[in-house]
Regions:
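Classical Sec-dependent N-terminal signal peptides that target proteins to the secretory pathway
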Residues: 2-25
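Generic helix N-cap/helix-start motif at coil->alpha-helix transitions
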Residues: 31-38, 65-72, 99-108, 122, ...
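Alpha-helical repeat scaffolds
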Residues: 55-59, 85-98, 120-134, 156-172, ...
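N-terminal leader/linker segments that initiate helical-solenoid repeat arrays
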Residues: 21-75, 81, 102
Length: 215
């Protein structure tokens, strides 16, 4: 049950996170010509949202991992956008002792991995580190606060009081939290979500159907 809910959470967060992952390119240091060309092409492809091409270029210039810190962050971003989450997590864990993982996405993924392993205290610790990299970014703040709420639900089997309100994300999140807890009002929350007149939440009919089948 926990693993299934993690899949829902990751899918939910991915929808919101995709809108904020593209960033301006960082100044380039001197590399050998071949790696420079591939790295630069990867940056251009990523900023043009050609995610598959970007990942190919970054894959072919992995020797830059220990030479240029911004490369690793862009490589991880391209993996996320291509839904290669497990590969991104494994790369981050492998390079965990290095300074190159000092960015928001790295600790968010480490937290997700810890939740999947039911290591909830570790997940909280990684979230606290991730908070130091949000730079007043509203979307990243919403993502981290939402994950904190889920971790609390998994640990305490109840919903956190005085949750911060992030609009539609909070509405969706609270519905899934009630679903996890088998709350008697889950049906009503799904119905309200699907029938919301201010936004199209029809994609959540699938989750509601799955909930009805399981119950």
């Amino acid at each position: 049950m926990l693993l299934k809910n993690i899949k829902y959470i990751v899918a939910l967060i991915f929808i919101f996170y995709q809108t904020s992952i593209y960033s301006k390119s960082t100044s380039l240091e001197k590399f050998d010509g071949n790696n420079f060309s591939k790295y630069f092409s990867g940056i251009v492809a990523l900023e043009n949202r050609n995610n598959s091409d970007a990942l190919d270029f970054f894959d072919s210039s992995k020797s830059l991992i220990d030479k240029h810190d911004p490369y690793f962050k862009k490589y991880i971003s391209s993996l996320i956008l291509e839904n290669e989450i497990l590969k991104a997590i494994n790369l981050i864990k492998y390079n965990k002792s290095k300074k190159i993982i000092n960015f928001f996405e790295a600790y968010l993924l480490l937290s997700i991995d810890s939740i999947k392993r039911n290591e909830l205290d570790n997940a909280n610790e990684y979230l606290e580190i991730a908070f130091s990299f949000i730079d007043n970014d509203t979307i990243n703040t919403a993502i981290l606060e939402t994950f904190k709420q889920y971790i609390f639900v998994f640990k305490e089997n109840k919903i956190l009081d005085n949750q911060k309100n992030f609009g539609n994300l909070s509405l969706i999140s609270k519905t899934f939290q009630k679903c996890f807890l088998n709350d008697s009002r889950t049906d009503a929350h799904f119905v309200n979500l699907i029938n919301d007149n201010e936004a199209d939440f029809s994609r959540y009919i699938f989750f509601y159907t799955s909930y009805l089948i399981e119950n």
